[in-house]
Amino acid sequence: MQKIDLGNNESLVCGVFPNQDGTFTAMTYTKSKTFKTETGARRWLEKHTVS
């Protein structure tokens, strides 16, 4: 997980997060997508983030 503090009690987060229903959400700073598996979420995140 990457976090950027914007000040004023605001921040941006990028990473893979588990959901209550057993799915995973991959989030970049501008996009997000839900996946059935953590592996799928990590692959999508790797493909959509700039290194």
Swiss-Prot record:
Family stated for the protein in its record: To E.coli YdfA.
Protein name stated in the entry: Uncharacterized protein YdaF
Protein species of origin: Escherichia coli (strain K12)
Record lineage: Bacteria, Pseudomonadati, Pseudomonadota, Gammaproteobacteria, Enterobacterales
